[in-house]
Amino acid sequence: MAVSKLTLAATSGKSCKILLGLRLLAFSATLSAAIVMGLNKETKTFIVGKVGNTPIQATFTAKFDHTPAFVFFVVANAMVSFHNLLMIALQIFGGKMEFTGFRLLSVAILDMLNVTLISAAANAAAFMAEVGKNGNKHARWDKICDRFATYCDHGAGALIAAFAGVILMLIISAASISRLVQPNKCCSTTASPSVVP
Amino acid sequence: MAVSKLTLAATSGKSCKILLGLRLLAFSATLSAAIVMGLNKETKTFIVGKVGNTPIQATFTAKFDHTPAFVFFVVANAMVSFHNLLMIALQIFGGKMEFTGFRLLSVAILDMLNVTLISAAANAAAFMAEVGKNGNKHARWDKICDRFATYCDHGAGALIAAFAGVILMLIISAASISRLVQPNKCCSTTASPSVVP
């Protein structure tokens, strides 16, 4: 009897570490997405005309906050990073507090809300980036990535990080929902995994 | 003892009906969003130039599949409608099958995946519609809703239905996650709510 409980404690300790690892990965993915997109800016000078033989130059800047979908992207990734940071702190330092049904339930619902948010932001930005890359001939919207290549490359990097965050958050959300069915007590890493009597 | 179990059966019967009602609402919201956007098309003729005094006319058509975000919107709303239809059928006709932990867990995870999908599609389409309505002066993308007002109105209607679907799916997902903590047996409406012994 004691042996099976020992194995339960061992596996639940291991699954908590995996969940903690996933949260750390998700935190770094969404935080880097928010930072890379938030700092994404490129300034370029183009020749826009000629007066006689003298070319007329104009300077243009591409910045993330020129596109509402990218502003939403930065805000949402920052919020989800904060959520994961909170959950990580809860798991590491919240060891003494009992992981009761209600606590697990709120973590599961919060995770679901955050995966909904990050998936909305990543997809809105992705479809907007697609228009920036390919344009839309029906709406006569020209592509911009032929003139602002660095800006688009950085944007693509932020999108990849954000979609990695979406996948990680889907796994984390499914895991925290599953924990409700077998509520193994996610012991904190500081407290030694107590053998369940 | 029997009285408290009777009240449990009564409340669980009621909560199942509410969940069923929410699913029916979500189903109609996402289905109408998919249909309205899928059929969204407007053809107009504009004067695009003059040769001498004779105006040159050209006919333009705005269709949902001219925009990848709207194609994603129609597909995602159709998928979430199908998911809800399946869950409704399961709840109505699946009465005899025991709602065990695993069944409730898979319903909760499926609901989470579907709210993630519908939120991605609704937000991607919303930000694209915003560009259609207001244009983007930085990218020099002109708005199109001044010329295709009906097309944009129908698109707005589909978006409102889809966001209603997102809110309903958030509530449904939270409810199906909460059911894992108090797994009241969601009895089917056909079988009379059996009194839990």
From Swiss-Prot, chains A, B:
The modification N-acetylalanine is found at residue 2. Residues 39-69, 128-156 are extracellular. Its main location: membrane. Residues 2-17, 91-106, 178-197 are cytoplasmic. Keywords: Acetylation, Cell membrane, Membrane, Transmembrane, Transmembrane helix. InterPro entries: CASP/CASPL, CASP_dom, CASPL. The chain crosses the membrane at residues 18-38, 70-90, 107-127, 157-177. It holds the Pfam family CASP_dom. GO terms for cellular component: plasma membrane. It is a multi-pass membrane protein. It is found in: Cell membrane. It comes from the Eukaryota. Homodimer and heterodimers. PANTHER family: CASP-LIKE PROTEIN 1U1. Belongs to the Casparian strip membrane proteins (CASP) family. This is CASP-like protein 1B1. It comes from Arabidopsis thaliana.
